[in-house]
Amino acid sequence: MACMAPRGPAAIPHPSSERAGLRRPARCAMAKAVNPRKKALPAPLSIRLYAPGMTPLLRAGAGGLAASLRAILGSASPAAPWPSPVRLGPGTATVEQEAIHLDWGGKAPEATLRALFGASFRVKQGFIDLPGTRPPGAPEPPPELAAALHDALKVTFLQHGKSTQGGARRRVTFEVDARPVIVESQGYDSFVHQTAWQSVLEALEVGSTSLASWAYPGAAERHIGVRVTKVEYTAAEALCACFALVGCVSYKLPQLRGGAFVALAPTNLVRFAELRPGLTPKRLRDVAVAGASDAVLAAQLVMAQEAGKKRLGAVLGTTEAVALRQMPWNAQQKIRGAVVRQDAVLEEVLDRYEAAAAALPHTLRVRKPEGKATGEASYFIAISALRAFITENLAASRPWYADFATATTAEGRFIHDYRDRDNLGALLWHERKGLIAMHPYLGEAEQWLVQSVHLALRSRFKSIYADTKESAPATRSNRLKGERERLRLSFAGAKTPEQVRAALADLWSRAGTNRELQEHWRDILQLLGPERWRAARDLALVALASYQGKGGEAAELEDADEAAGASEQS
């Protein structure tokens, strides 16, 4: 029962009352003197995966926090099972499937937060080091890979100059195609995440805090000075925003001179912490992606390979990729150029992407000094335009060949045409194997159409080769290239179902007997109607671009293509 003190005038004893034998009212034994200068300790902090306001980026940050705690545990107690309580100075952290709990150990939160951030965000030899992104006990990446991963963070989370401090430029030497190359990267002495615990502490004390653009790359305040449009974070949200640097995977976008990051929202924090180190690119060429679609599928594929494709849904929920690039109206910072979000991971989509990525890998190329300069050679990562096209279709749940007839690169080059010095083609000779690798992922009717076009092409080119057998090689080559160009323009220029049918009929009639066409005419006919004529046009150009000849005419075509490809690679 609570002590009750006398109220009103009765609470002030009269001097005569003591003389009359009345005692002064006793002070309540439960009452304690309160020091107004001493702050009460905040309650333990709990981060819940499905709490209101937890966006995919913040959920990815919760996964990054779990991965960092696992790295700290592995460093301090290698034999401890995961998940076990993680000691952070006076406090501890505990990871559950859908929550992370931080206890301050009876001390001010500052000591616990300092220990957590100090062990999670480091700089080694000028390069950013995030232990949560590496397997426990794994050796450090080679210098050229560490520099590339460092640069990927610079063009995503740490692009603003105020987010980093100090540091000298680092020179790294390694070999590409048995030739020494040198790459320079700006090193850092520190970066903003190392002291961001102060913002979390502010949120614990006053209820919320504001974070700069490094917490949400590519985002901006809609109306500067209008408070209702300003993003504010609770303590749990701020902590997740800080560790999004670990939970997300950052890539470089060489073609756009920008970057991309993928926020993988976990459904199981314990399991995600085990899988996160496997998402970090292990090869230099894998640090680059062709776009946001390539980034989201690349991250999902690696996660599926680590967890198993059939079990991926038990670990991963929403996946969101953001491509950042410079825009004409903002030269200082890269802003969002594309966002790709997938709420479900389809196994058949990952199978198709895996085939495309294997056949069309990014490649390292030596960049020679321009003109007569005698400087040192550097390198660049060459990105396949065809891979970018295929991955955009796959990420959008479209057939991988959709709009092959009309798709262009950012420079206005056509995806369906082979590149040469004097044309607007984008394909390179070696990318033909990428088209061939995707043939098994066509429907039955689509495959019959492609094969019927291949047979017709073989007949036409064989006839041209026979007609020019006694002619000069240049004459034969020009005839073969001219026929292929005529067919390409005929298919690409078709704008109606009638024009598509006319272009195909012209090819088939010139080629003579076509066994595939005769046996599967009813199947092919489905593609020539008003509903699917665009698909037929795309597939005809896929067949033309993926055609591999036999005998002499194959050599002529390949020589011409290799000459064009060599001019692009040099």
Curated annotation (Swiss-Prot):
Q: Which UniProt keywords apply?
A: Antiviral defense, Fruiting body, Sporulation
Task: Respond yes or no to whether keyword Magnesium is given for this record.
Answer: no
Q: Where is this region: Disordered?
A: 1-23, 551-570
Which range is the signal sequence, renumbered to this chain?
A: none
What are its GO biological-process terms? defense response to virus; sporulation resulting in formation of a cellular spore
Q: Key word Repressor present in the record?
A: no
Phenotypic consequence of gene deletion: Decreases sporulation 1000 to 10000-fold, aggregation is delayed. Delays for C-signal-dependent methylation of FrczCD and impairs fruA transcription. This mutant should not have polar effects on downstream genes.
Explain the induction of this protein: Part of an operon going from at least MXAN_7266 to MXAN_7259 that includes a CRISPR operon with transcription continuing into the pre-crRNA locus.
Task: Cite the InterPro entries for this sequence.
Answer: CRISPR-assoc_Csx13_C (IPR027811), CRISPR-assoc_Csx13_N (IPR019989)
Q: Briefly, what is this protein's role?
A: CRISPR (clustered regularly interspaced short palindromic repeat) is an adaptive immune system that provides protection against mobile genetic elements (viruses, transposable elements and conjugative plasmids). CRISPR clusters contain spacers, sequences complementary to antecedent mobile elements, and target invading nucleic acids. CRISPR clusters are transcribed and processed into CRISPR RNA (crRNA).
The family classification in the record reads: Belongs to the CRISPR-associated protein Cas8a1/Csx13 family. Myxan subtype subfamily.
For this entry, the protein name equals CRISPR-associated protein Cas8a1/Csx13
Q: Which organism is it from?
A: Myxococcus xanthus (strain DK1622)
